Amino acid sequence: MNFASNTLEIAVPPDNPARITSFADLAEDGVKVVVCAPQVPCGSATQKVETSTGVDLTPVSEESSVTDVLNKVTSGEADAGVVYRTDVRTAGDKVLGVPFPESSGAVNVYPIAVLAGSKDTELAQEFVDLVTGDDGRQVLADAGFGKP
């Protein structure tokens, strides 16, 4: 069973000096964009969006984690970075999130299940029920996760 989803979002400095409003803006001349390396999930998802849109990004840096991407944006080394919506939410007022509709082509969906070999299947099922119940879904939504 899937319990949550996460989509890409563009992280920009709070004042958005490069005036980024779309994924295509990231390919404009002079825009310094940072992405995750292709072997990390956020990098793979970014490549998927590039392929589906025909927008070719020329990043100034490919990082090994979303934290590193966010650090480049918050330090002023980049005008924008492509990360997950949840990462933008976690960063608080350090960045502004710019959603873009093309991210729907690269949604990460997260599964949850009680393992067959679990030592305490009853407790495991209670946890699954908590995460997938109303309270769990609200906590996930508050963190920026979407419905599965």
What name fits each language-model region?
Residues 4-148:
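Exported/periplasmic ABC-transporter solute-binding proteins
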